[in-house]
Swiss-Prot record:
PANTHER family: AUTOPHAGY-RELATED PROTEIN 29. Residues 157-196 are annotated as: Disordered. GO terms for molecular function: SNARE binding. The modification Phosphoserine is found at S106, S187, S188. GO terms for cellular component: Atg1/ULK1 kinase complex; cytoplasm; cytosol; nucleus; phagophore assembly site; protein-containing complex. Its main location: other. It comes from the Eukaryota. The keyword Protein biosynthesis does not apply. It comes from Saccharomyces cerevisiae (strain ATCC 204508 / S288c) (Baker's yeast). Present with 752 molecules/cell in log phase SD medium. Plays a role in autophagy. Functions at the preautophagosomal structure (PAS) in order to form normal autophagosomes under starvation conditions. Also plays a role in mitophagy and regulation of filamentous growth. Belongs to the ATG29 family. InterPro entries: ATG29 (IPR039113), Atg29_N (IPR040666), ATG29_sf (IPR039362). This is Autophagy-related protein 29.
Length: 213
């Protein structure tokens, strides 16, 4: 058997006079059976008991108190280390199971993307990257055309049109039909301006939804 720090005790003899009352440590026998009995006693202490009765244990095992204290400390350290390993193993198993669940959820999220259609949130299969880019470009083109259509019916673009028309017309020639058309255009511009101011917020919300801001 190989000697090591756990199964070997080294005694050093020091020259000189022995102190008064010094006694040689008693010889005792220690084995695995006694160690299991010691662990059974110290690990099943009553909650009402504040501390271990080392003197009583020393009488039971016929072993010095200092040795019992060292062995008890060693046993608690070993069992605490074993308990720590069990807890780490349990955490690793839980983490592994959670990772599997997260991978499954990520696959589902990648496979299905939410789409708003007819005020209902539906799950449809995700398109490839090229299809998504084409859809994005089509949506942007559609939104741009829609915005231009709204702006063309408003007073914003009509200002430039009226300005160019007024520059082409001579200042000294205005017929009656032209005046009537200007009045009708002014009234229609007022109506469109009022409707534009009312639907401005709705148009902005529609643009934000389409562009997914």
């Amino acid at each position: 058997m190989i000697m090591n720090s756990t199964n070997t005790v080294v005694y050093i003899k020091v020259k000189g006079r022995r102190p008064q009352g010094f006694l040689d440590p008693p010889k005792f026998e220690w084995n695995g059976t006694k160690e299991r009995q010691l662990w059974t006693m110290v690990s099943n202490l009553n909650y009402s008991q504040d501390q271990i009765d080392w003197q009583n244990l020393s009488k039971i095992f016929e072993t010095p108190e200092f040795f019992l204290k060292k062995r008890t400390y060693k046993l608690f350290a070993e069992h605490l280390e074993l308990l720590q390993l069990q807890l780490e193993k349990k955490r690793d198993l839980e983490k592994y199971s959670n990772d599997q669940v997260n991978e499954g959820m990520s696959d589902l999220i990648h496979k299905y993307t939410p789409t708003l259609q007819n005020d209902n949130l539906l799950n449809v299969s995700a398109s490839p990257l090229t299809t998504e880019r084409q859809d994005s470009e089509e949506v942007e083109t559609e939104v741009t055309n829609e915005a231009l259509q709204h702006l063309q019916t408003s007073k914003i673009l009509n200002i430039h049109k009226k300005t160019s028309d007024s520059e082409n017309k001579p200042n000294d020639k205005l017929d009656k039909d032209g005046i009537n058309k200007e009045m009708e255009c002014g009234s229609s511009d007022d109506d469109l301006s009022s409707s534009l101011s009312v639907s401005k917020s709705a148009l902005e919300e529609a643009l934000m939804d389409r562009l997914q801001f």
